[in-house]
Design a protein with these regions (language model features):
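Cofactor-binding active-site loop characterized by glycine-rich and histidine/acidic residues
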Residues: 12, 23, 29, 39-194
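N-terminal capping segment at the start of a domain
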Residues: 16-32, 204
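Alpha-helix N-cap/helix-start motif at coil-to-helix transitions, marked by capping-box chemistry
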Residues: 10-17, 221
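Short, conserved alpha-helical segments within structured domains
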Residues: 37-41, 76, 242-249
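A short, structure-level motif marking secondary-structure boundaries and short turns
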Residues: 8, 16, 30, 172-173, ...
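A structural signal for short, well-ordered beta-strand segments and their strand-loop junctions
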Residues: 35-36, 70, 264-267
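Glycine-rich ThDP/TPP pyrophosphate-binding loop and its adjacent helix/strand module
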Residues: 134-301
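Non-catalytic, mobile gating and regulatory segments of ester bond hydrolases
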Residues: 1-13
Length: 301
């Protein structure tokens, strides 16, 4: 894939801004949820979905042979809800303009639109953690706790390989704190031992979980050592909130594949990017409803 052109970056920045606003408004209205990790993953999530490498059909997310997308950091589900709201609203508007039925969803009742964000974490509304169902059939596993989704990803990737479906990828989005459970190391070992070159991790390396101290005070080294010591192919950038750099890494992740070697890309970010509440303080803690600091976050937009 060619490098991003300036016009492409401008478009991605607009999409990112819209996703950011939906995350903020949804959580401020509900007064619950996780803004920090949701915001820090926006660049890598959008770059992956819009790269052309991840195969999915927005109109039919349950379609056979779609890539298996897993939000291992299931508590950052506001990221997915907000992204789907932007994408599906764009498709709806394009249909209104053109009347071209290619823009229509296969099942409107399973399509997430901006109005659905108002029912986040409410009875009958959008769940507080990632679920493979309802309006998020794009996702292929129910997740929430740290390390939960990454272990399941090995099972899915192995099953696909056994069925001969080597071109169906398992694409996993996780934060660095989600790699601290013991199951993460078993996952890394198993993925390499099973030759899962169809497995792709994208790691939000923001150096914070829920604790006051940075991750590096208890977990030494970097993603290069964490995964490289298990013989994974590692690529990454220290500019994880910069679209040109992120896109280059995504391009490398999905093209420079080595036979039987699992793949991981890391993106150095700031948890709570542009939310004016950072690091662990942004974990599970939206700004008070209609507070002055909340509206300060809207000024750049």
């Amino acid at each position: 894939m060619e490098k991003l052109k300036p016009n492409d970056v401008e478009k991605l920045e607009v999409i990112k801004d819209l996703v950011d606003q939906f995350i903020d408004l949804m959580l401020n209205y509900r007064q619950s949820g996780h803004p920090g990790g949701s915001r820090s993953k926006v660049h890598m999530f959008l770059s992956s979905l819009l790269s052309g490498y991840v195969r999915y059909d927005l109109r039919d997310p349950a379609k056979t042979f779609n890539d298996r997308i897993i939000l291992a950091a299931g508590h950052t589900i506001p990221l997915v809800y907000s992204t789907l709201a932007v994408f599906n609203e764009a498709m709806r508007l394009r249909y209104e303009e053109t009347k071209d039925e290619r823009y229509l969803p296969k099942k409107p009742e399973s399509t997430l639109y901006p109005k659905d964000l108002l029912n986040f974490r409410r009875r009958g509304g959008l769940p507080g953690h990632a679920e493979m169902g309802g309006k998020t059939l794009l996702l292929k596993f129910n997740t929430g706790p740290s390390g939960h989704g990454i272990t399941a990803s090995v099972g899915e990737a192995f099953a696909l390989k056994r069925m001969g479906l080597n071109d169906v990828k398992v694409v996993v989005f996780e934060g660095d704190a989600g790699l601290t459970p013991g199951g993460a190391h078993e996952t890394m070992n198993s993925a390499w031992a099973l030759g899962l070159d169809n497995l792709f991790f994208l790691i939000d390396w923001n150096n914070f979980g829920i604790d006051d101290h940075p991750l590096t005070e208890t977990v030494p080294n970097t993603p290069n050592e964490w995964f490289g010591s298990h013989n994974w192919r590692v690529v990454g950038t220290i500019k994880g909130n910069d679209f040109p750099d992120v896109f280059d890494v995504v391009n490398s992740l999905f093209t420079d594949i080595q036979k039987n070697i699992p793949n991981i890309a890391y993106f150095k970010t700031r948890k709570g990017r542009d939310y004016l509440k950072y690091d662990n303080k942004s974990h599970g803690a939206p700004h008070p409803m209609n507070s002055e600091i909340f509206w300060q976050t809207k000024i750049p937009f």
